[in-house]
């Protein structure tokens, strides 16, 4: 394993430097994409773009819903990406506006915003262009904090083309925010270390109301072609992971869209709140005073040491032992928790409007289940890494990795409850057709599954998925048969974010 260094985002003058590993015909397709972007940019805005930026989607191989709890995850970048073409107006040009267009103009109408980094994002009126404004606000805030003068706000013309399926669990939103932020850096002629951009873009996405943990942005920015990555946090750090020979990851969309920003209060952000409450309750049960736990404990990783100490006194090192002892399996009411922590829940989360939205929507809180998932999933990530580093044969290694993926899915489904009927059906079809392991990937509640498949059966495996999962959806008109390649595909680990002057 090699550590990914904190060098700046690379700047390339040829597409081959970024996409070359994909081979001739795919490189030609990429060239057509960029040519189309240039042509459309000229048509829409009357000028050519100054520069391009791209950032890929990702598939998380293992480590779901634990990044925001401070634990490491193991994703890889995929070939599908978001490309931003951008042009900066001269100071004299008016009006001072940020105009954001999309190559898919039928689905995404042009959005126009004031050229004002201080503007608020209207979360009640969800627009696709908000993701660019997340990057816009974050870039200006970060430049200011670094003492970098980017001048008075000027107008910007922006054209977007994304091939990461939306609502797929493959981080289309992170690819959009990362490419937006990097495009802004490029057009203002500044560059920052990758790890700083990964942290910045994670914070950017919070402008849209999603309490992101940072994995999606970190792998999108820091990925290296041919390698998955172990992503650590606080500080963000990436270690290249070489996967065993003979296996391929197949990504398949359940066709249930996961609208993370729209359903945050009942799904994604709800789990963030439940984990925080579980960590505070555990801290108190394990000896902390309530006021100390409330001020110091933010994530389950903050109380892992106390949990392990308790487990150690009983001859174990597993923090789940403390969870089983001190958290009840039945859901907690707000009143139950307030009695333990001696504080009103609204006061605990008073600084987070998205968390307050969760409290308004929640009827109860499943602390035992959420903490059990986080601690067991964190152990699986390191078991995955240790397996890759072991002296097992490739065959044994692939089998072990598949078992870990299956265990992960069970935990996501039963303990974290972030699956859905379509994902359950898809995962079963994958396993029935020879996948060594299959699990939901991404936030869940829709989106994609990832399956570890022996290389020599990949074509037949994909064909079987088409027949046994997708054909009925094609017959019902859910998707077009000609678009099937967008929804199920094999992927090798791809390269990360880049600036392109082509």
Residue ranges and their predicted role:
Residues 1-58, 62, 70, 83, ...:
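C-terminal nucleotide
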Residues 77-80, 170-190, 453-454:
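DPxDG-like acidic metal-binding loop motif
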Residues 99-101, 149-161, 192-203, 400-404, ...:
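Beta-strand segments within the central parallel beta-sheet cores of soluble alpha/beta enzyme folds
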Residues 116, 136-137, 141-164:
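Glycine- and acidic-rich phosphate- and metal-coordinating loops
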Residues 191-238, 438-441, 490-495:
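Alpha/beta catalytic cores of group-transfer enzymes, especially the acyltransferase/condensing modules
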């Amino acid at each position: 394993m090699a550590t990914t260094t904190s060098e700046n985002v690379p700047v390339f003058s040829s597409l081959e430097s970024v996409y070359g590993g994909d081979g001739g015909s795919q490189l030609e397709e990429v060239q057509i994409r960029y040519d189309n972007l240039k042509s459309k940019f000229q048509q829409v805005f009357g000028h050519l773009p100054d520069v391009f930026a791209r950032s890929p989607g990702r598939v998380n191989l293992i480590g779901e819903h634990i990044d925001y709890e401070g634990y490491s995850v193991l994703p890889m970048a995929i070939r599908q990406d978001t490309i931003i073409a951008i042009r900066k107006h001269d100071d004299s040009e008016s009006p001072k506006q940020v105009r954001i267009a999309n190559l898919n103009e039928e689905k995404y109408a042009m959005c126009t915003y004031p050229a004002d980094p201080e503007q608020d994002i209207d979360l009640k009126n969800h627009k696709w262009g908000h993701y660019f404004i997340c990057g816009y606000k974050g870039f200006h805030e970060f430049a200011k904090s670094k003492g970098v003068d980017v001048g008075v706000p000027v107008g910007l013309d922006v054209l977007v083309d994304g091939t990461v399926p939306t609502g797929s669990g493959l981080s289309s939103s992170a690819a959009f925010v990362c490419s937006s932020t990097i495009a802004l850096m490029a057009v203002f002629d500044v560059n920052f270390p990758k790890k700083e951009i990964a942290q910045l873009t994670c914070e950017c996405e919070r402008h849209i109301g999603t309490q992101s943990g940072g994995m999606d942005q970190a792998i999108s920015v820091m990925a290296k072609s041919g390698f998955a990555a172990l992503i650590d946090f606080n500080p963000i750090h990436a270690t290249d992971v070489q996967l065993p020979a003979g296996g391929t990851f197949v990504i398949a969309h359940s066709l249930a869209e996961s609208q993370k920003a729209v359903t945050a209060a009942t799904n994604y952000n709800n789990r963030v709140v439940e984990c925080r409450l579980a960590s505070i309750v555990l801290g108190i049960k394990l000896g902390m005073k309530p006021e100390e736990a409330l001020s110091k404990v933010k994530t389950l990783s903050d109380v892992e040491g106390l949990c392990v100490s308790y487990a150690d006194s009983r001859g174990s090192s597993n923090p789940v032992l403390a969870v089983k002892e001190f958290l009840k399996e039945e859901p907690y009411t707000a009143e139950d928790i307030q009695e333990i922590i001696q504080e009103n829940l609204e006061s605990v989360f008073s600084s987070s409007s998205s968390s307050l939205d969760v409290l308004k929507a929640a009827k109860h809180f499943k602390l035992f289940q959420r903490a059990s998932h986080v601690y067991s999933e964190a152990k699986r990530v390191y078991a995955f890494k240790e397996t890759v580093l072991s002296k097992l044969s490739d065959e044994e290694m692939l089998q072990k990795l598949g078992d870990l993926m299956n265990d992960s899915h069970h935990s996501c489904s039963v303990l974290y409850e972030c699956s859905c009927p379509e994902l359950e059906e898809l995962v079963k079809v994958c396993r029935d057709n020879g996948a060594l392991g299959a699990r939901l990937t991404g936030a869940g509640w829709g989106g994609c599954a990832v399956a570890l498949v022996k290389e020599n059966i990949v074509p037949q495996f994909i064909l079987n998925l088409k027949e046994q999962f997708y054909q009925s959806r094609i017959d019902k008109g859910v998707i077009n048969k000609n678009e099937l390649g967008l929804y199920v595909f094999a992927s090798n680990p791809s390269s990360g974010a880049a600036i392109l002057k082509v």
